[in-house]
């Protein structure tokens, strides 16, 4: 059980996780501000009340850590993390479980197979999409967390963080391709 947590320590850790990704400078004021305090307080309260959320804290900003700001070429935005235990891994549509492919990922894979010529596509080798992130595809959800078994519960919580991220991307000098998947993401 969680007994004592210093929010500033958590904020500092999350900020340091983004060091050298280009996101640290773009999001510094948000990450070090009072809004991030509120987000962390809500997540901490849920944890202390015995409620679980996903993905695990160490993966909350994995999408940003995995795709350097200056190397981002495509932004794929989904709704929120898979709401099952041990499925969400911090990258939208990616899945830490290899024994079962989630329906939304199956749909994406089918769309790729149906629209991209075979000679132009790499084979899908796993449910982990970190290779996509390595290639400049930012795999974001509109919410970075959700309660276990309850999709959409943290949408409002992360809204301003997403606004900050999208603002930073829009004002990026390089043109980007945006793909919004799902009604909530659109």
For each of these PLM feature ranges, what is it?
Residues 1-16, 20, 167-170:
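Class I S-adenosyl-L-methionine
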């Amino acid at each position: 059980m969680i007994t004592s947590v210093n929010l500033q320590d958590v904020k500092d850790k999350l900020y340091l996780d983004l060091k050298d990704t280009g996101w640290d400078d773009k999001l510094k004021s948000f990450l070090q501000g009072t809004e991030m305090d509120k987000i962390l307080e809500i997540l901490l309260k849920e944890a202390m009340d015995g409620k679980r959320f996903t993905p695990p804290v160490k993966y909350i900003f994995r999408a940003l850590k995995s795709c350097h700001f200056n190397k981002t070429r495509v932004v794929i935005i989904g709704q929120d993390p898979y709401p099952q235990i041990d499925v969400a891994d911090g990258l939208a549509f990616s899945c830490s479980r290899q024994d079962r492919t989630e329906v939304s990922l199956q749909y994406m894979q089918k769309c790729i197979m149906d629209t991209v010529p075979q000679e132009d596509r790499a084979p899908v080798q796993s449910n982990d999409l970190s290779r996509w992130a390595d290639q400049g595809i930012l795999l974001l959800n509109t919410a970075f967390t959700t309660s276990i078994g309850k999709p959409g519960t943290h949408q409002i919580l992360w809204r301003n963080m997403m606004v900050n991220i999208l603002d930073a991307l829009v004002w990026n000098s390089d043109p980007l391709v945006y793909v919004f998947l799902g009604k909530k993401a659109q």
